[in-house]
Amino acid sequence: MRVLSFLCLLLVSYASAKQQFSELQYRNAFTNWMQAHQRTYSSEEFNARYQIFKSNMDYVHQWNSKGGETVLGLNVFADITNQEYRTTYLGTPFDGSALIGTEEEKIFSTPAPTVDWRAQGAVTPIKNQGQCGGCWSFSTTGSTEGAHFIASGTKKDLVSLSEQNLIDCSKSYGNNGCEGGLMTLAFEYIINNKGIDTESSYPYTAEDGKECKFKTSNIGAQIVSYQNVTSGSEASLQSASNNAPVSVAIDASNESFQLYESGIYYEPACSPTQLDHGVLVVGYGSGSSSSSGSSSGKSSSSSSTGGKTSSSSSSGKASSSSSGKASSSSSSGKTSSAASSTSGSQSGSQSGSQSGQSTGSQSGQTSASGQASASGSGSGSGSGSGSGSGSGAVEASSGNYWIVKNSWGTSWGMDGYIFMSKDRNNNCGIATMASFPTASSN
């Protein structure tokens, strides 16, 4: 009843908003989106979700029509409000303001102009954490997988590691399973435990409260130490990611992040200190935000149906994090395919900055970025804008970006990846809480 009452209130709010497209355009776009994302609703919920979708479609159009480096789209989160997204998929923000400027041990390396650890074979395929606030565990396994691969030298031994091992077994270190945790605490567990099991031997279930099933015989990697990056220093983060993939915490709370599709992500409203999501930096690059390139496998045709994707629960329970652990505790990408943490899409498929999506000409149809184009009208440029939130002055783009691996499956972003702005005052706090492990070569 509480959910239905909430949705009824949303109906009143969205029904009164000014519509940017015809009802036929909205309806066809929603129908196509529901088919693409295998979404079904009860009769009571359908109209509320439809109104939310319309509002998100308007937001995407407004943002993209301004032209810019960030392209939004009607992705897997297009039928939920930003408040639902925050409550259901992100943790309580961790305040990292006290960390800014904290000096850490210098990382002595001369960074290459560009780095992409996917191309080196050091990154496993995109995973999906499902209905569990365990992004901290995915960020941890990602950096540990990369460190192990690099330490293996000529063996080039890339092993997918078990997030469930961390969720079930690291609570005594201060982590809280599906309710939140920190990557650094997970590193401490792996060090003291003398290893972490492989994913194949300890598969992901997206469930909490299970008995620890770690077995020494199933260890896939070991680490001997970890190091924090100087907080707030993107130069230090670049030096670190020049050597290996790096675990980071970010502010992922804005609607622009929720509906991100491609391009270099820059959000003036992003906080550099209020961090609610753990992800993995797998490299960095530079390029014009208007250059064309692969759109991460998303069709630019007018149908917007794309490939079949996993259904996301729009009414899942929020994953609250325990105090001090929310920097990487967000419950992101909670799709119904939670029991499988690894998607079929291989990493390393993204290249270059993404361009806006082309629109079709069919009446009532939408482009891959969700722009209605009926009779050639209304789609806008589709090239994105860096200031959709309308807050703050927009800093000039450096054209530089971090290559970031998320854990929300391949139906979000560029096949599960996002290019985040680099060298723009630590946008979204990407360098505020960064750390990486050193693996044993054994």
Swiss-Prot record:
Glycans are attached at N228, N254. SUPFAM superfamilies: Cysteine proteinases. Its EC number is 3.4.22.-. One of its GO terms (biological process) is immune response. Belongs to the peptidase C1 family. It comes from Dictyostelium discoideum (Social amoeba). Residues 18-111 form a propeptide. Disulfide bonds join C132-C178, C169-C212, C270-C428. Residues 287-376 have a biased composition (Low complexity). Pfam families: Inhibitor_I29, Peptidase_C1. GO terms for cellular component: extracellular space; lysosome. It is found in: Lysosome. Glycosylated; contains GlcNAc-alpha-1-P-Ser residues and fucose. Residues 1-17 form the signal peptide. One of its GO terms (molecular function) is cysteine-type endopeptidase activity. This is Cysteine proteinase 4. PANTHER family: CYSTEINE PROTEASE FAMILY C1-RELATED.
